[in-house]
């Protein structure tokens, strides 16, 4: 099971930082790279919603001699037309080499400078390199998820590449149903599945700190949220921690 780390550079999604392990203090924020060092990880798989933290992650991995596998989680739509807003879903694009990193920058710029934070598949195909990029379909918020569980109408064109389907088991009520849909898509289309775990905090006991952070980041005028009434959909698991991943894995 692959651990997919996310940092605070993906605002509202993680309480982990990319700080130098030597600068992490007791009682302070946990660092992805401190976790990696303490647990002897030879690689860090980092999946972010932005490229803002990429250089810091790259620099830190070089300093520590750890392999960095960086993925950009990006919104996709059927087209840029307003009526296709309901087709929005997520994909993950991993860079395989230096050219892949440059292409990620072009893809990110296209999504956020030309469009309002999304691409369609024609845009993606124009910028794609099979040798330098790898496409993965995330478990949550993918086209499989929105089409089956959110009344979405995503029509993805992934014929230009050989993707991998991610699936997770985090004790959420929807996990079993969604996993079956992913498995069905995998069999029907001959696409491999890989088990992963999204990691947003270090210890299971950090779940309340993570919840408080999400409440702050998701504040809405007129809505009173608290730890007793967080109003965070599908937020009922402490599995999104490194500790939970470690309990199920001896080595990486």
Q: Where do the protein language model's features map onto the residues?
A:
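Phosphodiester-processing cores and adjacent nucleic acid-binding clamps
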Residues: 1-252
């Amino acid at each position: 099971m692959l651990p997919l780390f996310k940092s605070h550079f993906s605002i509202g999604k993680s309480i982990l930082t990319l700080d130098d392990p030597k600068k992490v203090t007791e009682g302070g924020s946990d660092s992805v790279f401190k976790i990696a060092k303490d647990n002897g990880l030879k690689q860090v798989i980092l999946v972010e919603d932005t490229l803002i933290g990429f250089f810091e992650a790259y620099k830190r991995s070089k300093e520590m001699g750890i392999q960095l596998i960086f993925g950009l989680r990006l919104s996709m739509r059927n087209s840029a037309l307003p009526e296709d807003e309901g087709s929005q879903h997520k994909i993950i694009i991993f860079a395989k080499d230096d050219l892949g990193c440059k292409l990620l920058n072009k893809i990110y710029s296209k999504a956020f400078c030309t469009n309002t934070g999304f691409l369609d598949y024609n845009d993606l195909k124009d910028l794609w390199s099979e040798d330098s990029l790898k496409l993965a379909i995330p478990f949550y918020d993918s086209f499989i998820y929105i089409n089956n569980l959110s009344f979405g109408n995503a029509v993805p064109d992934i014929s230009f590449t050989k993707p991998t389907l991610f699936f997770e088991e985090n004790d959420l009520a929807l996990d079993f149903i969604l996993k079956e849909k992913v498995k069905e898509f995998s069999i029907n289309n001959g696409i491999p599945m890989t088990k992963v775990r999204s990691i947003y905090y270090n210890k299971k006991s950090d779940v309340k700190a993570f919840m408080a952070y999400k409440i702050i980041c998701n504040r809405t005028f007129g809505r009173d949220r608290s730890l007793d009434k967080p109003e965070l959909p599908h937020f009922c698991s402490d599995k999104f921690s490194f500790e939970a991943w470690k309990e199920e894995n001896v080595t990486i």
